[in-house]
Amino acid sequence: MSKIIYCVFLKKYAEGLDAPCYPGALGKYIYEHISNIAWMQWQDKQTILINENKLNMMNIADRTILEKEMKIFLFGKNFSIKNN
């Protein structure tokens, strides 16, 4: 049985993720504040971004771009883990 969390993306209570899906402090924050539905929406968007921009996940610069886009998508432009 999954936990219910307040999803900051959906702005309502929803089923949380089964396990952390991203490393580090950001991953912990995502696990605690992003629902399974919101994460699936991000995965769809992520696939589009990787394909359209021909991002290479072996390239650190491309991974940095994708992480920035993830933060904007899930939390908004002014998100900082330090402020939350």
Swiss-Prot record:
GO terms for biological process: cellular response to oxidative stress. GO terms for molecular function: iron ion binding. InterPro entries: Fe_traffick_prot_YggX, Fe_traffick_prot_YggX_sf. The keyword Protein biosynthesis does not apply. Keywords: Iron. GO terms for cellular component: cytosol. It comes from the Bacteria. Could be a mediator in iron transactions between iron acquisition and iron-requiring processes, such as synthesis and/or repair of Fe-S clusters in biosynthetic enzymes. Monomer. Belongs to the Fe(2+)-trafficking protein family. This is Probable Fe(2+)-trafficking protein. It comes from Blochmanniella pennsylvanica (strain BPEN).
